[in-house]
């Protein structure tokens, strides 16, 4: 009684077909996974390339926010600076020198512009309260007129 040793030689192509088929399926499934992720990513990219935003309705009767103290200073400084330096036309240059001047000014020098800004801010708050009252009363009037026309 002799024992036979298992075959440890190279496998024939017909025998390896089953295992290669498994490998092919594994490769195909991973390609499918890559393809599916690509398909999922493509719709996410489309809105970035061509974003179409809805037009924002601007309420033209709404009061505009007031400028800060620095902008009131900028107006005065720009006029004075252009008179002294007519050759400088660049707003960048004017803005840069204005910012430097504003930083070096003392509080006492800035008070004038802070006062103007607070006055404008108070006017804005008054105008906003009037505007909100008009909008609230106007909204109720519009709803009543809409109901009259719908009958």
Swiss-Prot record:
Basic and acidic residues bias: where?
132-142
List locations, semicolon-separated.
Nucleus
What positions does the DNA-binding region cover? Answer: 63-132
Q: Which residues carry this modification: Phosphoserine?
A: 150
Highest taxon above the source species:
Eukaryota
- Low complexity composition bias: residue spans: 7-20
Please name the InterPro entries in this protein's record: HMG_box_dom, HMG_box_dom_sf, HMGB_plant
Q: Where is the composition biased (Basic residues)?
A: 35-56
> Per its UniProt record, what Gene3D superfamilies does this chain match?
High mobility group box domain (1.10.30.10)
What UniProt keywords are attached to this protein's entry? DNA-binding, Nucleus, Phosphoprotein
Give the principal location in a single coarse category.
nucleus
Q: Name one GO biological process term.
A: chromatin organization
Gene Ontology MF term list = chromatin binding; DNA binding; DNA-binding transcription factor activity; structural constituent of chromatin
User: What's any one GO cellular component for it?
Assistant: nucleus
What single Pfam family name could you report for this chain, choosing any that match?
HMG_box
SUPFAM superfamilies linked to this entry: HMG-box
Region annotation (Disordered) maps to 1-62, 132-151
Q: Which family does it belong to?
A: Belongs to the HMGB family.
What is the protein's given name? High mobility group B protein 14
Name the species this protein comes from.
Arabidopsis thaliana
């Amino acid at each position: 009684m002799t024992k036979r040793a298992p075959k440890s030689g190279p496998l024939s192509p017909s025998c390896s077909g089953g295992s290669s088929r498994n490998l092919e399926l594994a490769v195909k499934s991973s390609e499918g996974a890559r393809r599916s992720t690509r398909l999922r990513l493509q719709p996410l990219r489309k809105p970035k390339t061509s974003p179409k935003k809805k037009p924002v309705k601007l309420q033209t009767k709404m009061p505009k926010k007031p400028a800060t103290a620095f902008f009131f200073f900028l107006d005065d400084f720009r006029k004075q600076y252009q008179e002294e330096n007519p050759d400088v036309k660049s707003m960048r240059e004017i803005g840069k020198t204005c910012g430097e001047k504003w930083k070096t000014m003392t509080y006492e020098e800035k008070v004038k512009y802070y006062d103007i800004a607070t006055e404008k801010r108070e006017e804005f708050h008054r105008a906003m309260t009037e505007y909100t009252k008009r909008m609230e009363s106007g909204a109720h009037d519009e709803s009543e007129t809409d109901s009259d026309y719908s009958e």
